[in-house]
Amino acid sequence: MSFDISKFPVLAKANTPEELRKLPQGLLPQVSDELRQFLLQSVAISSGHFASGLGTVELTVALHYVYNTPFDQLVWDVGHQAYPHKILTDRREQMHTIRQKNGLHPFPWREESPYDTFSVGHSGTSVSAALGMAIAAGKEGVGRKVVAVIGDGAMTGGMVFEALNHAGDLHNDMLVVLNDNEMSISENVGALNNHLAQLMSGRFYTTIRENSKKVLKGMPVIKEMAKRTEEHLKGMVVPATLFEELGFNYIGPIDGHDVDSLVETMRNMRNLKGPQILHIMTKKGRGYEPAEKDPIGWHAVPKFDPSQFKKPTTKPGLPTFSQVFGKWLCDMAATDDKLVAITPAMREGSGMVEFSQRFPSQYFDAAIAEQHAVTLAAGFACAGLKPVVAIYSTFLQRGYDQLIHDVALQRLPVLFAIDRGGIVGADGPTHQGAFDLSFMRCIPNMIIMAPSDENECRQMLYTGYCYQDGPTAVRYPRGFATGAEQIDTMTMIPIGKGVLTRQGQKIAIVNFGTTLEAATDAAEKLDATIADMRFVKPLDLGLLEQLANSHDVIVTVEENAIMGGAGSGVIEALHKMRIVKPVLQIGLPDEFIKHGAPDEITAELQLDAQGILAQIQAFMA
């Protein structure tokens, strides 16, 4: 569907940045107001990331007004906040398709628009990418400007400071906009600071500053006194010291919702030499009261009615696997004060809210710093604590070296509760949990488990927690559990042992994880044997040998990349046992899985019951 653009008369004149730049500056506040209302109505219909975009409306308008995009390059960090950017860059009429199959990508995406200079989805990449572009722009020598936009949350990642340190050393021209939405606009972010920012970014101040540096270069004592005086004066009103020490000229903080001040400050900063930081203060959820009061709850939303001022409530039903994990975590912490749980800024998504409230001294949020989170767990384990790392599959990729070097190599008993394993859906290729079984399976000393239902998930978490001879991983999907009867008593599962769940003939289906239900449906129609393998590593070699010797064909099923996944492990095991048997591997293909509803993607990839049946029948034909 498309919106009645006549309700947004000024925004209608700014379908592209080129059109926006033709408008008089006096209309920019109205453009911002209409853009915010359009975003509100659009996301209410489509679902998607919400609160972040509401907070970056004025910033987006100012950036595209001052900078000659797409010639000048904007790099957005993560991309949750980039919906206003998409609306202003000739994608307004497609916004209702965002995150849907064949619709707009949920994040800035190079293949989608020339205005999207860098494809994103994970945090902390913008400054590094922008620095690369800035260096290239300097070599090109045609006056191209480069801007990175990063939020205060992403600034907790070490990669950002690595890039800032490098940029300050190289001294290429670039602007980093720090969008600080941790707190609401405070009194010191008003007329005085806006005026100060414009003054300090203006030609007079910067010329005096640079010329003074040249004059004082040969007089180090006086130069140091001048520097201290400048820092003292600036330090009274701005937290400049950290960025200045990294080699950046710091401007701010200024009101990120005052579009005129943003435009004037950016105009001044556009022509400054060297690396620049513009610190702006914004309010996440700006302009929609429920989102302002609860920006975390309104970070991403389903379809909703804006007039109701509340998110739609879901009917009580099956728990999610994240909730199953959260309950297990609380149950264990109640009996063992040595348990410590770590998350890299994913408390809500990982089901840890209750745990963090009931056991605050055992809860550690490492912020968006996956490398640190994994090695923090290693340190806990060395000291005799029992760490559990709750992490999304896609984010564990960012702590891979630490998993190998700091945990597995030392055979430390760290339990990894890996959420979002397999197809995630609407967030697309940056968030699909497609690779974890493949990249963990090759690591020595790892125990890897894939539960088929929520009860098995609890028992596996307990098994991993009790196992003290090295790291363990329990990998489970996003979404609702299967409805299996829960067994409250927790018992250890024998390491490396699978179970037969159906006896058939000719075809043996070897399943890993929650694809068991779909695989079982296919097995019923084929009169096939099916095994719930439970362990990806170590494999149940005895069960595999038995199945291979009594069946004509082996079929492996997993929601992971086929290359290097559990099925590859089965083939390797059969080869080692010198058993020659046809093997069909069913799983994710050798491509990045696009965005869409999980059931749509599953059907397209033939990972549902009908697709598994069709693949086996084609293989047997």
UniProtKB/Swiss-Prot annotation:
Keywords: Isoprene biosynthesis, Magnesium, Metal-binding, Thiamine biosynthesis, Thiamine pyrophosphate, Transferase. It catalyses: D-glyceraldehyde 3-phosphate + pyruvate + H(+) = 1-deoxy-D-xylulose 5-phosphate + CO2. It holds the Pfam family DXP_synthase_N. Thiamine diphosphate binds at residues 80, 121-123, 153-154, 181, 288, 370. One of its GO terms (molecular function) is magnesium ion binding. Mg(2+) binds at residues 152, 181. Its EC number is 2.2.1.7. GO terms for cellular component: cytosol. Catalyzes the acyloin condensation reaction between C atoms 2 and 3 of pyruvate and glyceraldehyde 3-phosphate to yield 1-deoxy-D-xylulose-5-phosphate (DXP). This is 1-deoxy-D-xylulose-5-phosphate synthase. It comes from Shewanella frigidimarina (strain NCIMB 400).
